[in-house]
Every structure is written in structure tokens, then in C-alpha cells.
Amino acid sequence: MKTRILMIAVLMICSMITVSAQEKAESPKGKAIVQVFGNFHSGFGQDNNNRGFELDRSYLGYQYDLGKGLQIKGVMDIGQSDDVNDYHRIAYIKNAQISWKTGKLTLTGGLISTIQFNMQEKFWGYRYIMKSFQDQYKFGSSADLGISASYKFADWLTTDAIVVNGEGYKKIQKNDGLMYGLGATLTPVKGLSMRIYYGLNESSDETKENKQNLATFIGYKGKGFSIGTEYNLYKNDGNKQGNDLYGFSIYGSVKASKTTDIYARYDNLSSKDDWNEAKDESAIIAGLQFKLGQYVKIAPNFRMSMPKLENADNRYMGYISCYFGF
């Protein structure tokens, strides 16, 4: 039944796209997508030997606007994988999607960006330095195979929904249930953004629990500064009842000049009944960002991790993060 519903939704998108394509065409246009994240890092104290240059991640792709609201995009993600030695890099297809926008409605299908923490990541604004909270602590994936829709009811209210496989873009499965998500974004006044999201990731095994995710966010961008905070709850990690994770993140930045930003962030991750105590932590990152022309950014930053495991020592790292992209 679920497969039929998904197929019907995909066919509806395809039929609407066909109708749009038959209308008077606009001049097509495209652009390359190139983003490279790298760094030099060095630890202090117990991490003194953890130092070196690192090519963290590269995104290579192309986006093409066909006209009449129709757009296609393909992006390759080249980065680290937990499945192989840390020195190796694996290439994945992160996005292979087609989207159609008409009026206040936008439909997207294929290997698409998810809606779980997309807004928080954009507001944080320093993805090449560190992932946003939910991505950093593996509350969900940034892309997956499925369909999504968003509708702008008013200038201050937009809602979105998504149905995807639920395993992310690195593990494209088809037999382990689906993930459903629903979100709403409010912008009641200029500069102020609020968002709430709920997601349910089905388990194909009746003896195991469904995963659930609740995310809330509020942020304000003013002239030359921004500040935001988010609270996240992730229930039944690994489809195990009681394996709940929760935490919050606070981040902000100040524009010191046209080419210089000052930024800081505090994360706090906890687990129910301390089941994840070995990885629970609070963490701080702070630093500067310098823009060297249009395509290059350099960001020296200091990081401190404070584990919640009893008798565990704090860890300190210094980074020089680098970005190239257009």
C-alpha cells in the first residue's frame, strides 16, 4: 500500500512537469556547483599528535533551469566514510533531483535534500567549518531518495512535507520502511525565523521501534549579526526503545568588517538514562572567518569538547578551515 502511494505521488509530479514543459519555454540556463572543504588541525594535550592537513569534503555538480519553474540538479559528494579506512575517500551521488515550482507550490523528486535540518544549517552558515547539530550527532541525513513538497501560505508561513526511504543518500534501501516528515516555518517579522519539524522513520521489523525526530528552531538576523538556537529530540536510535538522544545548540556571528566575521557556537548532547554516555558531550567552537575574494574563505577556530563520561578529560583542538566554491 505504501509503495502504491509513493508511486502515485511520483506519477503526479511527472504529469505536472510534462504539462509545464509543453507550455511556452523560457531560455534555459545552468551553473556549475563546486565546493571544497579542507583544513589544517592540531590537537593539544592528549591530542597533541593529532595534527595534519585534511581534505574533508568536496561537492561537484551542475544545476540547470529549464524554464517555467522546472529545474534539474545533480551533485557528487566526495568525502570520508565510516565503512573504510579514514585515509580513503568515497564518492556518492548526493543529489539527482528534478523540481518544479509553480506559484506558491514547489515539488521535488529523486535523490533530494531533506527538510529536517536544512534551515538550521543555512542559518548557522559555516558548514565547511562544522556540521549543524543534527548532522554532527547523526540525528538524520541531509539527503535521501524520495519526494518533497512545500507550500507558501503567506509571506510569514511556509509548510513542507517529505516522504523518503529513511536511510540517507549513502545507503539507498527499498525494503526497510519509509520516513515521513512534516515541518512549518514562520517569519512573523523581518529577520526573525521560527521552525518546527516532526519526522517518523518506520521500522520494517514489528519487534523494533520506529525512530522519531522532533526539531525546533528560532533565530534572528539583524544588521551585521545573527543569533539562533535549536532544540532536538531523537527517539529510539537504532530502532531500540529508550535509546533517546536530545540536546540543544546556540550559535551566533558578528560581521566585524566586509571581509571578516566573528562566530561562536555551543552544543550540548545528552542521552536518556545515559545510554550514550561515552559520546554525550558539550562542545564549544569559536573563531574568525576571512573572505579572500569571491570564492575563498579561511577560518581559524578553536574547539573544546567536554565529555560527560565520568573521569573523561576535556579535549582541545585548533583548526584553520578553508573553503573554495562557486
Indicate where each model-derived feature is located.
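Alpha-helical transmembrane segments and their juxtamembrane interfaces
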Residues: 12-14, 78, 304
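Conserved long hydrophobic alpha-helices within structured protein cores
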Residues: 9-10, 154, 257-260
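Outer membrane beta-barrel
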Residues: 23-166, 176-178, 185-194, 263
